Amino acid sequence: RPNGYKLLCSWLVAKKLNLASSFTFFKSEYRNNKQSEYIASAWDNRYIFNLSGTYNFPRHWSFGMKVSCIGGAPYTPYDEEKSRLVTAWNAQGRPYYDYSKYNTGRLPAFGQLDIRVDKTFYLKRCMLGFYIDLQNVTKSTFKQPDIYMSTGVIENPSDPLPEQRYKMKYIEQKSGTLMPTLGITFEY
């Protein structure tokens, strides 16, 4: 049962300032049958916000900025107890999900700020432009579910095989890189 709302706004001020924004609020759930409870779908981030603007300066210079925010996506946590069992891990070589908690976890929201500066030259029959674009200026981190991994060390080697458990560790999954780009545009 997906549903949502979207608001769009756009402003143009005296050919110098151009602003556009959008806010989307939504909820996306489903259920396996009429008796089961609703479950968040994989793309149920709940909201998306974008604000972008460009200001045109004299002599064909322009400055642009974009702010983007998105709510955290749902995820399914691991079944840590089952994943630790030596026989279970060796059978699959990766962790098991706890499907009784399907999509009950939620990642943190993510926001990003991008900026761009352009300089344009108008020649007789063409246009030449140069720009520098900086994505994720604030170095905001985008988080994914951590990876649950076996260290290969058995914590209780003297126990019977069905009771033996691996020592486990989590590997953090996040990124937050500042991405600079230099560019040239040419039109004729």
Task: Give the location of each predicted region.
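Extracellular loop and loop/strand-boundary signature of outer-membrane beta-barrel proteins
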Residues: K6, K34-A40, S100-T104, K167-E172
